[in-house]
């Protein structure tokens, strides 16, 4: 008979996946669009999504917040609080939508549908998030953000989420 607490084991595994996420972003990050270098791809959401499907959407959100804060204060410190907020909004939406859908349909087809819906939700939520938050932290006028919203910001978010799904 084992004396280990299942919740403690789950948290330990969650911690390992969060650490992997931070290591991945340390080694792999690059801009997808040369005209918007502040929009960088990184694979950090892959371990977070694994945690979400393995342990549930609330654990995925917990991992998202921890990873976003640690990355924002260390590996990606140049983004500061702006990067932390945007990461939590994007990945948080992704894990909650995909995680809750997958909880209802734990099949391969259910996982694919959940991931697709998560990708779409990510893309949709980041449009108003960029319009509201980006001007505050970057000083870019709303008109400049609006001009790149459909040709750059939406495709970037769909590409990043799609690859990480």
Predicted regions and their residues:
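Loop-helix junctions at membrane interfaces
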Residues: 1-165
């Amino acid at each position: 008979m084992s004396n280990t607490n299942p919740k403690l084991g789950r948290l330990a595994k969650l911690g390992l996946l969060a650490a992997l996420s931070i290591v991945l972003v340390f080694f792999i990050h690059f801009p997808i669009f040369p005209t918007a270098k502040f929009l960088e791809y990184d694979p950090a959401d892959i371990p977070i999504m694994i945690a979400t499907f393995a342990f549930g959407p609330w654990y995925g959100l917990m991992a998202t917040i921890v990873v976003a804060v640690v990355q924002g204060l260390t590996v990606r410190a140049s983004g500061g609080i702006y990067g932390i907020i945007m990461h939590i909004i994007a990945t948080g939406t992704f894990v909650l939508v995909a995680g809750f859908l997958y909880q209802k349909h734990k099949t391969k087809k259910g996982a694919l549908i959940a991931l697709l819906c998560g990708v779409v939700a990510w893309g949709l939520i980041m449009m108003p998030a960029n319009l509201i938050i980006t001007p505050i932290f970057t000083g870019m006028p709303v008109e400049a953000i609006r001009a790149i919203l459909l040709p750059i910001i939406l495709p970037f978010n769909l590409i990043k989420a799609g690859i990480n799904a």
